[in-house]
């Protein structure tokens, strides 16, 4: 009888361990999908309008990236929380309404606390509503998965988007103007001024990388680098 009890206890411990490992792997996979494997910017190629238009500087790119990440996380949270109460027939209009409400809140916050950056980003803040990645994650993930997993998915996808935006913005700013994180104090306050660096000094900027053609060239470089790394891993 004692041996049977010990075997049952050992079996329960193995099952608990297997479930715990499975849960950890799910969290890791969701994060990896957002950051690298299914990155919204350099894999899915979604949200190209703000990606190309706003990434002229690292500060602008980071500001829009953080706003997008906040919107993604909040909308995934709300949609997952109420997924059982949203009628399938009208789910898309409801998703758009939730996204628009969240974007409006973020827009008002940026207007209040980062006004200079708000002016710099302009129309691209409200245009977050039309970003395909947000409604895509709502439909593909948040409406079908648990609350915590949906929050993590929104954060991971948003972080992947923000990283891609910031890297592209930094690349264009360094080559085009010789600086990085110029005007970062408009986003994080005067205490963040130490992040601004002048890589090289020039009398005239390299306009090609500041203008839209530079955005396409920079994005092409990022895609090439990612594909190269993926091929090496294989």
From Swiss-Prot:
Keywords: Cell inner membrane, Cell membrane, Electron transport, Membrane, Translocase, Transmembrane, Transmembrane helix, Transport. InterPro entries: NqrDE/RnfAE, RnfE. One of its GO terms (biological process) is electron transport chain. The keyword Repeat does not apply. GO terms for cellular component: plasma membrane. Signal peptide: none annotated. The chain crosses the membrane at residues 62-82, 92-112, 116-136, 151-171, 205-225. It is found in: Cell inner membrane. It is an enzyme of class 7 (translocase). It is a multi-pass membrane protein. Its main location: membrane. It comes from the Bacteria. It holds the Pfam family Rnf-Nqr. Its EC number is 7.-.-.-. Coiled coil: none annotated. Part of a membrane-bound complex that couples electron transfer with translocation of ions across the membrane. Belongs to the NqrDE/RnfAE family. The complex is composed of six subunits: RnfA, RnfB, RnfC, RnfD, RnfE and RnfG. This is Ion-translocating oxidoreductase complex subunit E. The gene is rnfE.
